Amino acid sequence: MTLEMSPEQIQESKIYREWGLTDEEYLKIKDEILGGRLPNFTETGMYAVMWSEHCCYKNSKPVLKKFPTTGPQVLMGPGEGAGVVDIGDDLAVVFKAESHNHPSYVEPYEGAATGSGGIIRDIFSMGARPIAILDSLRFGPIDNGKTRHIVDQVTAGIAGYGNCIGIPTVGGEVAFDESYAGNPLVNVMCVGLIEHKHIQKGQAKGVGNSIFYVGAKTGRDGIHGASFASKEFGSGSETQRSAVQVGDPFMEKLLLEACIEVIQNHGDILVGIQDMGAAGLVSSTSEMASKAGSGLRLNLDNVPQRETEMIPYEMMLSESQERMVLCVKKGHEQEIIDLFKKYDLDAVNIGEVTDDGFYTLYHKGQMVAHVPVDSLAEDAPTYYREAKVPERIQKFTDSEKYLPEITDSAVSEIFKKLLAQPTIASKKSIYETYDSRVMTNTVVAPGSDAAVLRVRGTNKALAMTTDCNARYLYLDPEKGGAIAVAEAARNIVASGGKPLAITDCLNFGNPEKPEQFWELTTAADGISRSCLALDTPVISGNVSLYNETNGSAILPTPMIGMVGLIEDVKNITTQEFKKAGDLIVLVGQIFDDFSGSELQKMLTGEISGKIDFDLETEKVNQDFVLKAITDGLINSAHDLSEGGLAIALAESAFANGLGIDVEVDLSNAQLFSETQGRFVLSISPENQAAFEKLLTESSASSEVIGKVTDNGILKINELSISTDEAVSIYEGALPCLMK
């Protein structure tokens, strides 16, 4: 039980500092907001979580304003539980990504599981039925025992929650780097489908309307979780287990179905709905009121509790999972109670909407908080941080390009070593723990460029992916940010989809350090540039800052989640070569792009140098490939990324056990170059003429570089290895390293 302090004791002890408030912020609350009154224990705690970076984006709000967020396809952008994009037929796709980084280091299983649960609630709070989960994971070196434990438990947590609730985990990415050793990244994306008429907002309006608490009971888990996520890791952070929530996917399944039933069958009495996520009850209710320009009066005696003698501070800040807030029209309370009772869930009237603009709490007949509602939400502070270019950036800019030399005798061994690199090697051992087929909508499961799910009742499908190569951002945040969006779009296009929009998780270091704030704001410039060029507005997202351990920051890692629309399921394309005799086509030119590459990291142990990125060529090549797919000319398509052409060719050959015979005018090293904007395609010989005719109508570059064979040999210039041996290395590397 938390011991409550008096307002005077709070001021004297400055305990608010431990909760994340600065002296200046505390004085602002006391003098400017409360007119000289000392905030009490509950009020101070509420401001501490609501003014955390995790809740109010006080350091990143100016950066987020750079993003393009509108477009004809966007029905709802940032500001609600998730973004909503039109896909025609009065249907929309709803999606968002969230981070659960700090909790997943302290308690990897529960941290990852509750990260999944939280983002699922964001989706069904919009009225959508969740249809897919994707993840983006970053870990330290896998030869470290602690890292292996975190990998094992994080993936088990995601699998456990998704498998139990019955939502398929269909895609994602995993990468390893020293910078994540003390600060893994666990980003989870959820995608849902909705009819336009059921789209909801998180708002509490209409004087006298009732505020309902629904779902699981409140405990003491997760108190100050939002503040915990807004600080650097230090030597004692691993012991902060009370800040980590505990999830129950079976409870969430009931909550999901109950909320969907309310929205679809009782939408006329539902004013607003929101998930109780970070900062729990105070965040959800104050945000709903602030967005509507209302006030709220809540009676905490009615809050369902699973622990005894909880004080208002604990009830308001608890981040117990599987809880929602509903605003219901006055006079219809019993309908809500009866509906949730059918699912054996609590549905309790805890307050009402007012018109005084205040957030007022009562407990045991006493007023325990009375503050302006906007001061908790819309009027939280915003900081304009100093940005300074890190010294390393100038060094990289002035340096020569990294140009490795690989002899004919060494190229096959280099290729084998690259196949076994943890970031490149097959993640099959991870994604096979996920149920990717439940709900029976999955057409393309994990392992291809993007996951693809059919849209039932239509001839359409959705392609979805997560992407980011943080090494590029370390060398050049602007170009790296632009590349992250472009690679996500390449994955969608290679699957036959037209990119629609993105969500993001901006994982960066301490924004109070000018060099790290520069990384954030510069990466946002690059993301915006690609979003504008590729017509993929930012419709939702999340910011996770202070990803540092003992002063050492992670690589800047803005994860991009993207969804694309496949208008006709016949255009769904996968990366594997289909049959011997098909021609292998390279779209895009290959240059000496080794800075930040997997090859550079493997051969030198570091990354350095300057990177190039031609966004105009990227767009041209993507448009050409998508047109070739929709014209029915392509049998397979795969984007080139880590490991370059050689790795992409191998991955395309693996699934069906085929061979390749490729002769291409490249040096041995260039087989592993990571020039952007490239695809490997396979086409039937009878489609070659039509393909080349289409090429003449585009400014894209393309050449036939070989053919698919059935001899089981991967031959690329002087590189030669059996497909079976390559598959064995590729699929066996990660399980071997995890032992």
From Swiss-Prot:
Compartment(s) where it occurs, according to its Swiss-Prot or TrEMBL record: Cytoplasm
Principal location: cytoplasm
Catalysis performed (reactions): N(2)-formyl-N(1)-(5-phospho-beta-D-ribosyl)glycinamide + L-glutamine + ATP + H2O = 2-formamido-N(1)-(5-O-phospho-beta-D-ribosyl)acetamidine + L-glutamate + ADP + phosphate + H(+)
Binding site for Mg(2+) 2: D122, D275
Pathway: Purine metabolism; IMP biosynthesis via de novo pathway; 5-amino-1-(5-phospho-D-ribosyl)imidazole from N(2)-formyl-N(1)-(5-phospho-D-ribosyl)glycinamide: step 1/2
GO molecular function annotations of the record: ATP binding; magnesium ion binding; phosphoribosylformylglycinamidine synthase activity
EC number(s) recorded for this UniProt protein: 6.3.5.3
Protein family membership: Belongs to the FGAMS family.
Subunit structure: Monomer. Part of the FGAM synthase complex composed of 1 PurL, 1 PurQ and 2 PurS subunits.
Protein name: Phosphoribosylformylglycinamidine synthase subunit PurL
UniProt source species: Lactococcus lactis subsp. cremoris (strain MG1363)
Annotated gene: purL
